[in-house]
Amino acid sequence: MKHDWWLSAARPLDQTACALAAERQRRLTKPRGSLGRLERLAIHLAALQGRERPVVERPWIAIFAGDHGVAEEGVSPYPQAVTGQMLRNFATGGAAISVLARQLGAELELIDLGTAEPLEPPPAGVRRRHLGPGTANFLRGPAMSVRQGLDALAAGRDSVRRAQAAGAHLYIGGEMGIANTSSASALASALLEQPAAALVGPGTGLDAAGLARKVAVVERALALHGAHAGEPLEILRRLGGFEIAALAGAYLACAQEGLPALVDGFICSVAALLAVRLNPACRDWLLFAHRGAEPGHRRVLEALAAEPLLDLGLRLGEGSGAALAVPLLQSACRLHGEMATFAEAAVADAGR
């Protein structure tokens, strides 16, 4: 395996398909530009997929799970046992993302990268790639070893390759891990060079005292590791989580393999920011599903010059916001591909 595989070139966008799609939009039976962003989405997807009429009928959803050592600092109201329990809930169909995946007819891949209290035997349908019983507490040292960080990145890459081999049209990454908003907030604060208080939110429902404690924990982590903020791979190792690293690896691999990625909420967007810092060329392959309720999400999206599709006040994670946005992409593609042209419908075109 190439040690720095994430630096490999991203697949270039197909400018011929882009031009053909743009010309098709001009010929459809509607005032030009009247479908707003849906038109631009269809044209961009055409460039990504290399075809005049893109399709998003086979989405692939991968959920990466991993626990965080910083949970012992009381930054989440939930115990770490919940991570493994939710993996079982995903597998048995009871979680929000399970419902949405069924609705979409999407493949739902579940990957346990390292839970503090893993379920034995692993629930049917859960792929186990054990990197450790969660990360270390980043107030005491780096969250991950070098080996763990590289293996987590590779786990995301390998998921994308499975999706590509299965003929997926779109890749969605999701996450599960108690205390992972603390990790994401610390990473965002370091990468954006912004204060923790501006980025840290309540996560899964902290009260005011819990939020203050979480801010203080992130500030201590930045004091310990912040000198490495300009080194994205090292700051990921020091402040990140297995699932965040896997998501970053997945987004990098999507660009290299030529598979469009739809980025979910705050944690996934932080992983996307890391991916772009590691290899800026991957940015073209990232679509952003929604703007969530976590205060740091808006700032991360701004740093990525991202224009999210939805704004519903979501803060669940699991890839749920991205799954909710898939029908919008499908509609953009169907309108683009199935509407009649002025010539086909024998309708006069005002521009001709």
From Swiss-Prot:
Its protein name is: Nicotinate-nucleotide--dimethylbenzimidazole phosphoribosyltransferase
The coiled-coil segments of this chain are none
- Entry keyword annotation includes Transcription regulation: no
Enzyme class, UniProt record, top EC level:
transferase
- Please indicate which superkingdom the organism of origin belongs to: Bacteria
Q: Please give the family membership noted in the entry.
A: Belongs to the CobT family.
Q: What is its EC number?
A: 2.4.2.21
Q: Which GO terms describe its biological process?
A: cobalamin biosynthetic process
Write the gene name.
cobT
Q: Which residues form the active site?
A: 318 (proton acceptor)
Give the GO molecular function terms.
nicotinate-nucleotide-dimethylbenzimidazole phosphoribosyltransferase activity
Protein's job: Catalyzes the synthesis of alpha-ribazole-5'-phosphate from nicotinate mononucleotide (NAMN) and 5,6-dimethylbenzimidazole (DMB).
The protein's matches in SUPFAM superfamilies, at most eight in alphabetical order, are given as:
Nicotinate mononucleotide:5,6-dimethylbenzimidazole phosphoribosyltransferase (CobT)
Q: Pathway listed for it?
A: Nucleoside biosynthesis; alpha-ribazole biosynthesis; alpha-ribazole from 5,6-dimethylbenzimidazole: step 1/2
Q: Which reaction does it catalyse?
A: 5,6-dimethylbenzimidazole + nicotinate beta-D-ribonucleotide = alpha-ribazole 5'-phosphate + nicotinate + H(+)
User: Can you name the source organism?
Assistant: Azotobacter vinelandii (strain DJ / ATCC BAA-1303)
Entry keyword set = Cobalamin biosynthesis, Glycosyltransferase, Transferase
